[in-house]
Regions:
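Accessory C-terminal segments flanking Radical SAM cores
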Residues: 195-207
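A long amphipathic alpha-helix within ATP-dependent nucleotide-binding catalytic cores
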Residues: 186-188
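Conserved non-cysteine loop/helix-boundary elements of the Radical SAM core domain that shape
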Residues: 1-182
Length: 207
């Protein structure tokens, strides 16, 4: 798919039109449920410009991003357009697992994306992690959480893999979820919602 023109451009035009018809009040803005950063800069700018007018003072404004399509230029654009929270789809810090999940970024790219976002000025950073992949052990999962808390993140979302094409062990997944509920709070991330853990004051208002 060409995310710079054609159907993508028509979609953003239609979406911008719908956004333009929204009144208020708006309590949160969340652009995601896909990969907004896959869009070319002109379309991304159009989407953000159309949305920014809804972002009143103090409103949580989140954009989802994938490591492979997040760069300095897009981070600057986000800041210019009032985005104050990023949710980065890290998924894993192990290259073999990322490949098995069909992700095209590397573990290093994921960590670099988080660090760059922090350097650019994003103080409210979430990362998504997936547990329960085939052949994943409890030790593997613990190592993922250990790496996550070393990064400058304020929020961690942990999701169990759900894919009919990739069988998972429900008991193993349950143990990994229990591990998350023990490990992350012990390191300052409060378990405030089913899949979400946050440092004090950084709970996602949109959840």
């Amino acid at each position: 798919i060409d995310y710079k023109r054609g159907p993508a451009s028509a979609y953003i035009d239609a979406l911008a039109g719908q956004i333009g018809g929204i009144g208020g009040p708006i309590s949160t803005i969340f652009i995601g449920g896909g990969t907004p950063t896959a869009l070319g800069m002109p379309l991304l700018k159009k989407l953000l410009r159309g949305t920014r007018r809804l972002a009143g003072k103090g409103i949580e404004f989140t954009v989802e991003a994938n490591p492979e399509s997040l760069d300095a230029g897009k981070l600057d654009l986000f800041l210019d357009e009032g985005v104050n929270r990023l949710s980065i789809g890290v998924q894993s810090f192990r290259d073999a697992k990322l490949k098995k999940l069909g992700r095209i970024h590397s573990a290093k790219k994921a960590m670099d994306a988080v660090i760059l976002s922090k350097k650019k000025g994003f103080d409210d950073l979430n990362i998504d992690l997936i547990f329960g992949a085939p052949a994943e052990t409890l030790d593997d999962c613990c190592a993922e959480f250990a790496q996550a808390v070393k990064l400058p993140v304020t929020h961690i979302s942990c999701y169990c893999l759900e894919c009919e094409a990739i069988p998972t062990d429900e008991e193993d997944s349950a143990r990994m979820y229990s591990l998350a509920m023990e490990y992350l709070p012990a390191r300052g991330f409060r378990h405030y919602e089913v899949s979400n853990f946050a440092k004090k004051g950084f709970e996602c208002a949109h959840n």
